[in-house]
Amino acid sequence: MSKSQQPRHLKLGAMVHGVGHGWGEWRHPNAQPNASTSFGFYKQQTELAEAAKFDFVFIADSLHIHAKSSPHYLNRFEPLTILSALAAITSNIGLVATVTVSYTEPYQVARQFSSLDHISGGRAGWNVVTSWLSGTADNFGKAEHPPHAVRYRIAKEHVNAVKGLWDSWEDDAFAYNKQSGEFFTPSKLHALNHKGEFFSVKGPLNIARSRQGQPVIFQAGTSEDGRNFAAENSDAIFVHVESIEEGLAYSQDLKRRAKGFGRDPESLSILPGIRPIVGRDEAEVESRYQQAVELVTVEDAIVALGRPFNDHDFGKYPLDAPFPELGDLGSNSQRGGSDRIKQLAKDEGLTLREVALRFSRPKRDFVGTPEQVADAIQTWFERGASDGFIINSVLPDGLQYFTELVVPVLQQRGLFRTEYTGHTLRDNLGLDVPANRYSVAAEVEDKQEALA
């Protein structure tokens, strides 16, 4: 039985986002304004998540900033560096880093993630992004930012090359025979010799596979190109959805596409990002919710709204007029997100102010007492709208409240583990170790010769 055929269990990841996802969260009285460059903060958050038996921690990234970027992105750690440090102080929790394909080389990415995979004992995950902010091109000496469709062609070739490099060494390649002097078996080392539309990579990679075979592939795809890429290549998908109905439709669509690519759809984990606010009783829930609401100003919400539209300046439009007609603006940045915003504004006849606050203020879906938040999580999971969630804390102590109050309820209901049962990120997520392509080919050849 493959791991994907075993009984379903809820999966949980923690987004560690320094001073917060939004523009105003750093102003909370208990917030640590330098959290995004504080190893102590990342250590504390990761230890909370591991103590609660989370599957992984997740570090987002961006390679372009400007004066109005959110505080976290203005001054923060590079993901692979901070995760390598966290690997040394953790034992079981997965470590997922965001790295772009549009401004990196496959050999570089393959080597970096393999190194993290070895340092952590097989707990690395790669969140594949194509980078939607056009200003990124200016930081890498590029004349222009690749168009949306081209970025996904780049992504497919890049990821295929990286996976090929990860298989450079068969699992038993290193003989370490001191008596004979054979350090490795030459026939078990393989050059990739890839030559494609965007990349030329000879290989082989100068580091072996880890105990989990290859790092786990994450991706966030909502556009048509993004959904197809995720369904074909990803092990787990990070997604933003507005409702359980939207989550169910997305999950069904992605798993249908995965099956079309010849994959077991149950091996694919759909993980919506949520921003839960938890209180011990109704009064504390309302108090904490209002704290979060008060951190979002209309001015900040207008700036935040521009991000999926390639940092478009919405400040030039009347706040209380209907949401402006934008044509195809956003189609070459975060297409799925910008299209969803435009469609929602049109369907509900919203003003610019209403749209901005709708997407910046915390939603009520996962706001409540521990039992109420657990109820919402259980409903989404059991209806098939998600296979788990990525927890993005709104308040400075949000992850602590969630791990100490909600996780025990989920455990009591048999939805979430009480102990780790494996050692790798693949173990945590119920994923099989991918076979080395060259070992598989050799086995097939041996069988054919035996039958000849």
Each language-model region and where it sits:
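Conserved, mostly hydrophobic/aromatic
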Residues: L12, A49, K53, L86, ...
